[in-house]
Amino acid sequence: MIKKGSQVRILRPESYWHNEIGTVATVDQSGIRYPVIVRFDKVNYSGINTNNFAVNELVEIQTNSYKAK
């Protein structure tokens, strides 16, 4: 289960971060097409370090035991 704080690998081939590892920032439950926002250490050509992905475009590498306050 992908949740906030999880380490994920990107499977989307056209993405700048294809096969890179990022950290899940948020997971939207409202039913949108790309509900998972992933944050990366390196920036793309535009200076952006986050992107939205569908759940099926991600593979969870490590689960973080993040607990909201």
From Swiss-Prot:
Location(s), subcellular: Plastid, Chloroplast thylakoid membrane
The protein, known as: Photosystem I reaction center subunit IV
Function per UniProt: Stabilizes the interaction between PsaC and the PSI core, assists the docking of the ferredoxin to PSI and interacts with ferredoxin-NADP oxidoreductase.
Top-level taxonomic group: Eukaryota
Gene: psaE
Family: Belongs to the PsaE family.
The entry's keywords: Chloroplast, Membrane, Photosynthesis, Photosystem I, Plastid, Thylakoid
Organism encoding this protein: Cyanidium caldarium
Record-linked InterPro entries: Elect_transpt_acc-like_dom_sf, PSI_PsaE
